[in-house]
Structures are given as structure tokens and as C-alpha cells.
């Protein structure tokens, strides 16, 4: 069965940067991070960076530059300088710039580039990153792609700049799958949708005729698992994003809750509602469809998420009274409570870096998005309000996306926040949106 076919147009254009040719654009500066990211610092001073319009025969160069600048600015680590302050007009991006002109406006780094159309119709995108105070080129790269993938080129360039200046992998060349919500509150239509991480290129991947919830990416981002009430009972499906083909993962008696992939993509972990009203955590091996029960309690165990190495699982359980966070081995062994604060905890998700667990906390009439170390220590609440829920990690483990509903008759919206808790941004979507899940870096 096909639903919501997506033409990704990516595999034929990019494959792990295989189309990148950098032999003629060498890095001439020793590797070092210019921007220091310290999540305990509280306030990070953004790095002033000048991003010149890429030379091109049309508006495309300026469009690409705008996306690069928006990506970097939204991270909270960079402050793109207004183009009206530029002294030098770049006419040859291959030549060294007049560094003194850029130092005068306090540009710590400079980006120049060019877009040219090739005889075969493809685009060639080149860029260089300069250390203006050091007077040296830091990196230079070029890419080939089709014209309709220009936004993806911009995200890849922004990732390269981010990585070179921070020492961390970027997260801009990624996608987010979420639940699109439209219509009045009493008759809300919920469809699965996918978009670029900045809210562009929204595509619907379900038709809204059946309630669909909890979409989650596979580790290779080519598949999404989700729960659907098609036919009136909850079922878990696996959707191939490139073809639109889907298959039934399991048709279990009772409700199936919050399916999520293992890091190797070979299993799905989920909760199954039992006849006595309890819910326990199971895994299903996608290779042979065998299920294994991991918890056996009279409580509600749900919201399971693997550690990046696949050796542990964090989940929510009310076995001690209020919902709290627990960690156990991937085989269900040695469950132990890690959350010790007041209130209730839910929707835990392990950081891709392996160092933190994000969660939703309900306490004193507010819903907060927070993080803690994997042993439960160092709990920090990043944002609080009427209803914040459902954190998901960017693949570099530095930023979270979540959904928020304000008091009143409105609906949920998507936001991002970094680990300082100070850089919070709304992601614009066509309708109300909830339950986001961030993809790995695209390949």
C-alpha cells in the first residue's frame, strides 16, 4: 500500500558528501575550534561572521546565502553581520579578501562563494571560509547538485562552517517528521508530515483519514515507524519515505504505544497495553517479527528510548506512584529509577552523544522540557510553561525540538531550544504541529 509518496531526490544527488570535490580548495589553517561551546556557561557570545552573497548569474546565490546565514544565526552561536556594513565587495571568491576591511567591521570569520550552472544542467556550488584576523583560509569546498536541491546545498555548507568553527558536527542538513494538526479542536485532523529542520519543504506522508501518532525515524532516516488507528484499532506501521510503501509491523491485541527504532535499526521498542490496564515494554525484531517482553509489572511502562550504543533503555513508569524515569539494560535487566525530583516525568529520549537524557516534567501546574545526566544527576529545566512536551534531539546533541501549546483555544507549535536554555526559537509550520522527531544527518 502506498501513502504520501515523497520524492526525496537526495540519493541521486548526494551520498555522504560523495559529490564533494575539495582537492582544489584545500584547508590551509591548522584545525582548531574558534567558537567554544560550553553548556554550563549560561551565556554564549555569538561569533560575528560575514557571509557575502555568492556570485551567480541570478538570484540563486543570494538565496543560498540567506539560508546559510539563517541556519547559523538560529543556532545562537553566530551573529551574521548586516551586509550594509560590508566595505569590500567580493568580485573574485578565489582570491584572498582584503582582511583589514573585514577586521574593521569585527568580522571574526568570512564566507565567500560562487554558484555556476554546468553544461549538464547541474549546479556547482563553491565556498571558502576565511579567518579574517589570522589572514588565512580555513576551508574550501565545492559541490555539484541539481537546481531543485539548492536549499540542501545551503544546509550542507552551513554544517561545514558550523563544524569548522565549533568543533562539533552540524545539524542543518536534517529533516523532522511530526504530526500536522488542522481544523477545529473538536474535529482536529492529524496527518504525518516531514520537513527540513528549518520548516521548509513540508510534505504530508499520511492522508489524515486515520489518526496517526508518534512518528519516529530509522537510524538511516529512510524509514519512519508510527502508530495508526486505521480500522479502529492501533497498529504499528513502517513507512519507506522514498517509495511511500508501508508495511504492518505488528497487529497486537490492545493498544500499542510509542514505537521507536533501536540504534542499529533492527528492532522496534514499544509499549503494549495489557488486559489488566498495565502497559509493558516489548521489542520486535524486524528481521523475523519475533517479540520479546522486557518489563513485567502491574504499572504503566512506556516511552522507551535506546542509548546510542543500544546497550540501555530509558523509559517512564508509574510503578513507584507518580511517573518517573527508569533505565534498564536493553534486555530488560537491572531496572533502576534515575529521576528523583518532585513532579512527574515522561517522554524521555537519550542524547545522540550519550551524555544526557531529555524529558518532559510536570510540576506545580507547569510542563517543562529538561535534561539530566544518564544517572539522574544534574537535572536542569530549559523551558517551562502551560504545556511543553515531546523533546527530540538534533543529531549533534546540542539542540532540542519540542512542541508547546499555550493556554486557550489554539493548538500546539514547534520550538527549538539549545542546552543553555537561552536560545529558543519557533519553527514555522503551515498548521498546528506536535510530536516532532529529528532525523540523523542526511546522507
UniProtKB/Swiss-Prot annotation:
Transmembrane domains' residue ranges: none
Domain of life: Bacteria
Keywords assigned: Cell cycle, Cell division, Periplasm, Signal
Example GO biological process: protein import
GO cellular component term, pick one: periplasmic space
Stretch forming the signal peptide: 1-33
Oligomeric and partner information: The Tol-Pal system is composed of five core proteins: the inner membrane proteins TolA, TolQ and TolR, the periplasmic protein TolB and the outer membrane protein Pal. They form a network linking the inner and outer membranes and the peptidoglycan layer.
Protein name per the record: Tol-Pal system protein TolB
